[in-house]
């Protein structure tokens, strides 16, 4: 109990204050200056120069609109001679920050509601009606089974289904891509950005871009880095892939627009930087369900008034426009906070040198004696002298 009281008294009735001791030591002096220089280099070089710790920052707010141009020609036995324009291959016409360009297609023409044989596969091939379950509809089925086994061709029988007939046969994807000419289509990206904290706005069609230039330019990282018109084949090429290979089964491409701006400089120096990458994983070894595709239909009625449709399985490339960026501008508050933090860090040099001198060096006991001085209470000391 007495020990606890003594410890409590020592805690309550003692006070320590720093004492400046000048130690003439090359090792300690050099170490102290080296640590101080490292801290100064960190504060000035990293915090203020690289990270711009004197600036207030804001994240970009963005809007994007796109427009595709280009015409393709096909001549097949199924469709004959046909022209494909923007209304045919951009599906849907407008999306938020992205667009889909059809590059390949499987068409099933003149479908009507009726009964027809399924496409042969492991689950639909049959030998008798016993192999077909009436009323069943699997996840990969084109319709509802009638329970009958009917001839698909002269040598193969499959289960009959109630469906849109004839059913789609997507066993073989056309190669090369049906719209391989899409490689030369162009994409105009119009991007408006805003930094609300600084009330700063800009768009990627820069003030010096004229109508004449916009009609003739195509983006090139070296010759035309600020042209907002991109050739589709070049986008895929810049991401390290082949457009013709990607066009067969489709995929997803990212067009990245970076707006990192230093608003302490002229507004004309705040410029967009474009980069490209493929967003869907293309793993050759695990090539299950590759690419990008979806189905849609065009409905109409024949002369007799019967409903028909053309089923379209569209393969293509979806282009996602991804806008990101950060703007910074001088502000006194972050500047003072970082200066204060830097000054506080300089105290680390003294703490580190104290640890070395007082606990690691050979003369640590001598230095400790010089560093600390124990002083009794003046009033108690005076009373003791008077008693004597």
Curated annotation (Swiss-Prot):
Positions that bind ATP: 67, 69, 186, 188, 293, 295, 313
Gene Ontology molecular function, alphabetical: ATP binding; cadherin binding; copper ion binding; extracellularly ATP-gated monoatomic cation channel activity; identical protein binding; ligand-gated calcium channel activity; purinergic nucleotide receptor activity; signaling receptor binding
Reaction(s) catalysed by this chain's protein: K(+)(in) = K(+)(out); Na(+)(in) = Na(+)(out); Ca(2+)(in) = Ca(2+)(out)
Effect of residue 135 to S: Does not change protein expression; does not affect membrane subcellular location; increases ATP-induced inward current
Sites carrying sugar chains: 75, 110, 153, 184, 199, 208
One CC-aspect GO term: membrane
Keywords, sorted A to Z: ATP-binding, Cell membrane, Disulfide bond, Glycoprotein, Ion channel, Ion transport, Ligand-gated ion channel, Lysosome, Membrane, Nucleotide-binding, Receptor, Transmembrane, Transmembrane helix, Transport
Domain of life: Eukaryota
Extracellular side: 55-338
Cytoplasmic side: 1-33, 360-388
Known regulation of activity: Activated by ATP. pH-dependent and inhibited by acidic pH.
Cellular localization per UniProt: Cell membrane; Lysosome membrane
Disulfide bonds: 116-165, 126-149, 132-159, 217-227, 261-270
InterPro entries from the UniProt entry: P2X4_purnocptor, P2X_extracellular_dom_sf, P2X_purnocptor, P2X_RECEPTOR_CS
Keyword Isomerase found: no
Transmembrane segments: 34-54, 339-359
PROSITE patterns: P2X_RECEPTOR
Membrane topology field: Multi-pass membrane protein
GO biological process, one term: negative regulation of cardiac muscle hypertrophy
Predominant location: membrane
Binding site for CTP: 67, 69, 186, 293, 295, 313
Subunit and interaction comment: Functional P2RXs are organized as homomeric and heteromeric trimers. Forms heterotrimer with P2RX1. Interacts with P2RX7 (via C-terminus); this interaction is functional only in the presence of ATP. Forms heterotrimer with P2RX4; functional differences between homomeric P2RX4 and P2RX4/6 heterotrimer are minor. Interacts with AP1M2.
Family of the protein in this entry: Belongs to the P2X receptor family.
Protein's job: ATP-gated nonselective transmembrane cation channel permeable to potassium, sodium and calcium. CTP, but not GTP or UTP, functions as a weak affinity agonist for P2RX4. Activated by extracellularly released ATP, it plays multiple role in immunity and central nervous system physiology. Plays a key role in initial steps of T-cell activation and Ca(2+) microdomain formation. Also participates in basal T-cell activity without TCR/CD3 stimulation. Promotes the differentiation and activation of Th17 cells via expression of retinoic acid-related orphan receptor C/RORC.
Name this protein carries in UniProt: P2X purinoceptor 4
Organism annotation: Homo sapiens
């Amino acid at each position: 109990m007495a020990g606890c009281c003594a410890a409590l008294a020592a805690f309550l009735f003692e006070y320590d204050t720093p004492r400046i001791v000048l130690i003439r030591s090359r090792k300690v002096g050099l170490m102290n200056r080296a640590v101080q220089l490292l801290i100064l280099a960190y504060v000035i070089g990293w915090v203020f120069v690289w990270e711009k710790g004197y600036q207030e920052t804001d994240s970009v707010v963005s809007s994007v609109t796109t427009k595709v141009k280009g015409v393709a020609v096909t001549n097949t036995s199924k469709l004959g001679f046909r022209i494909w324009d923007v209304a045919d291959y951009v599906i849907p016409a407008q999306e938020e920050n992205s667009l889909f360009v059809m590059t390949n297609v499987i068409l099933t023409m003149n479908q009507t509601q009726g009964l027809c044989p399924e496409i042969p596969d492991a689950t639909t091939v049959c030998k008798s009606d016993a192999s077909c379950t009436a009323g069943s509809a699997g996840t990969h089925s084109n319709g509802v089974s009638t329970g009958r086994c009917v001839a698909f061709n002269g040598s193969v029988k499959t289960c009959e289904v109630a469906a849109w007939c004839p059913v789609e046969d997507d066993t073989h994807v056309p190669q090369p891509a049906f719209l391989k000419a899409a490689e030369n289509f162009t994409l105009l990206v119009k991007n408006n950005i805003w930094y609300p904290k600084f009330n700063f706005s800009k768009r990627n069609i820069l003030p010096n871009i004229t109508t004449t230039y916009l009609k003739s330019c195509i983006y090139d990282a070296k010759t035309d880095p600020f042209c907002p018109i991109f050739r589709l084949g070049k986008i895929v090429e810049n991401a390290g892939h082949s457009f013709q290979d990607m066009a067969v089964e489709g995929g997803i491409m990212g067009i990245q627009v970076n707006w990192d701006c230093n608003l302490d400089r002229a507004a004309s120096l705040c410029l967009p930087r474009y980069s490209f990458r493929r967003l869907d994983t293309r793993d050759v070894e695990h090539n299950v369900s590759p690419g990008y595709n979806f189905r849609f239909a065009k409905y109409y009625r024949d002369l007799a008034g019967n409903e028909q449709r053309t089923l379209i399985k569209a393969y293509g490339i979806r282009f996602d426009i991804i806008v990101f960026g950060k703007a910074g501008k001088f502000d006194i508050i972050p500047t003072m906070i970082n200066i204060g933090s830097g000054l506080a860090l300089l105290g680390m040099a003294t703490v580190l040198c104290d640890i070395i001198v007082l606990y690691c060096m050979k003369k640590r006991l001598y230095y400790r004696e010089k560093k600390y001085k124990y002083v009794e209470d003046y009033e108690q000391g005076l009373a003791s002298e008077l008693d004597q």
